[in-house]
């Protein structure tokens, strides 16, 4: 089984989107727009856009980044309060939409054609669009050039590389094995899937975690652990610390990891 370290393996992504609050539409305050976004998700950039919008339209824009935004939004929106617009990852959309907290959006085809189709799939609920995609975050293989000048092209190369690095007191790869967000790309790389996606929707009766592809990917991961090339107890903090200290040559992480990587100066 040749599992490449390219885009197919690390296709799992989190899609951030702009959602319009349905309760807010019911009690719009003329001349004012309140937007919520997480503090680490382009807050400063959005604030600048808000200033320009305010200057162009005369509508006051307030950008806020409350703690635990994703938990506070349904609480306040359920009572008709909260922001007019919220930016968050698409994994929360279904629950919000099911509770009637989001307004349907109707971008024309010309606008939709500007973005990849899968981004619209991520913000569709019961056949209706409930948000605008604004960004996609994906996992990637991050490597230390001092330890691995040329990263492996297939997963099958990792055991040999790990043995070579172990002789130098290092290891080849560490990443979070406690959350399926990080392990799923490997499981899905050879055709594994959670629910079958057809005709624009998921079939919850067609579960693919027991498929041949899923078994192949998981078996490969288990073999890496059995052969001591990886440790089953590795979590996010352990993997991050090992990579940033130069103890392991490679890790699998997202763009949010780069701040600490840069600080480590490896």
Regions found by a protein language model. Give the residues of each.
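Glycine-centered hinge/linker elements that transmit conformational signals in sensory
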Residues: 161-162, 203-233
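Hinge/lid segment of periplasmic solute-binding proteins
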Residues: 90-140, 150-162, 185-186, 213
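Extracytoplasmic/periplasmic solute-binding protein
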Residues: 130-134, 139, 159-206, 248
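Extracytoplasmic/periplasmic substrate-binding proteins
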Residues: 219-266
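Conserved N-terminal structural module of periplasmic/extracytoplasmic solute-binding proteins
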Residues: 2, 12-13, 25-95, 109-112, ...
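Short, solvent-exposed loop/beta-turn-alpha elements that line the ligand-binding surface or hinge
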Residues: 107-115, 165, 193-216, 263-265
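Short helices/loops that flank or line small-molecule/ion binding pockets
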Residues: 71-82, 99, 147, 163-167, ...
